[in-house]
Amino acid sequence: MPKKALEKIIDQAEQRLELLKELGINSFPREKVEPIFRKKTLALKRLREEIGDCQRCGLAKTRARIVFGEGDPSAEVVFVGEAPGEKEDLSGKPFVGPAGKLLTDIIELGMRIPRSRVYICNVVKCRPPENRDPKREEISACQRFLKKQLDIVQPKVIIALGKHSAQWLLEKEEPISQLRSKWGEYNGILVMPTYHPAYLLYNRAGKRELWMDIKKVIEYLKKGEIG
């Protein structure tokens, strides 16, 4: 992970602590909370270093950059997409193209959470040629890194964006149209499968269904129970 990106994550963690103070939440002593953020940030940094210049599958031959993931290392919500697209491949950041703009609107306008307060990653870290679906062997080559990311962040909810994300997290084979909107579980973490934002760019009818799924997550975060 680049030094500037790491510094940004640490700054976000410090801003979060200041916000808690302003809200009058002082039940988390600074000496106990800060090490948690630092520990998770360091763990993600080490994981990125472990991936290195990955050559574990054929995508290494065609990618421009590895798209590791970004966001709050202590996020309550993690979004897991399928694979980087062209703009993500060039920037090294997840969800920065048209689908990323839509995802940002879902997070910030719909859920009313700053994008910087969630964590975003993909099932595979490299762009498949011509944005094709990731192959089973490519997902297999990447899966241990996704497992470690989720184990480090330990969110309350994972929102699975698209078929490949939902099928991997839930270990199911049904299409996303059947998996979406139903709570599942991954290693004790609640999972809400829904459509990938890219799907909504050419299928506007799916926006209403996606919003129904997101509202279930919002209600759970508010009440702490599944509706």
What are these regions (language model features)?
Residues M1-D11:
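Short, small/acidic-rich helices and loops at N termini and domain boundaries
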Residues Q15, L19-G227:
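A polyanion-binding, active-site-adjacent surface
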